[in-house]
Amino acid sequence: MALTPADVSRIANLARLELSTAEQSDLLVQLNGFFGIVERMRAVDTTGVAPLYTPLSAVQDVSLRLRDDAVTETDQREANQKSAPAVEGGLFLVPRVIE
C-alpha cells in the first residue's frame, strides 16, 4: 500500500497541519517506508505460532512476579489521628466548605 502526495495532503489537512511541499515529500517517503515495513511483517506466515505478551517468554518460563497479598503494616489509625483536631468513628472530620 503506497501513499500518494494527495494522501499526505489529506492526512495533513485532517491533522490540521500546514506542510510545505518539501515537508510533504519527506513525509511521503517516511510513511511509505513505514507501510513497507508493515507489509513485510504481514507477509510472514505466523500459522501455528502462539502469541506472546513478551518476547522473553519464547526463551524462558515467565510467570507473573506478584507479591503475596498480605498485611505488612499494623493498624496505626489511632496514633495517626491523635494530632487531628476532630475525629469521629475513626474518620477525620473537616469543616464544611460548601453550603
Swiss-Prot record:
Its EC number is 6.3.5.-. The keyword Protein biosynthesis applies. It comes from the Bacteria. One of its GO terms (biological process) is regulation of translational fidelity. One of its GO terms (molecular function) is glutaminyl-tRNA synthase (glutamine-hydrolyzing) activity. The keyword ATP-binding applies. It catalyses: L-glutamyl-tRNA(Gln) + L-glutamine + ATP + H2O = L-glutaminyl-tRNA(Gln) + L-glutamate + ADP + phosphate + H(+); L-aspartyl-tRNA(Asn) + L-glutamine + ATP + H2O = L-asparaginyl-tRNA(Asn) + L-glutamate + ADP + phosphate + 2 H(+). Keywords: ATP-binding, Ligase, Nucleotide-binding, Protein biosynthesis. Allows the formation of correctly charged Asn-tRNA(Asn) or Gln-tRNA(Gln) through the transamidation of misacylated Asp-tRNA(Asn) or Glu-tRNA(Gln) in organisms which lack either or both of asparaginyl-tRNA or glutaminyl-tRNA synthetases. The reaction takes place in the presence of glutamine and ATP through an activated phospho-Asp-tRNA(Asn) or phospho-Glu-tRNA(Gln). NCBIfam families: gatC. Heterotrimer of A, B and C subunits. Belongs to the GatC family. This is Aspartyl/glutamyl-tRNA(Asn/Gln) amidotransferase subunit C. It comes from Leptothrix cholodnii (strain ATCC 51168 / LMG 8142 / SP-6). The gene is gatC.
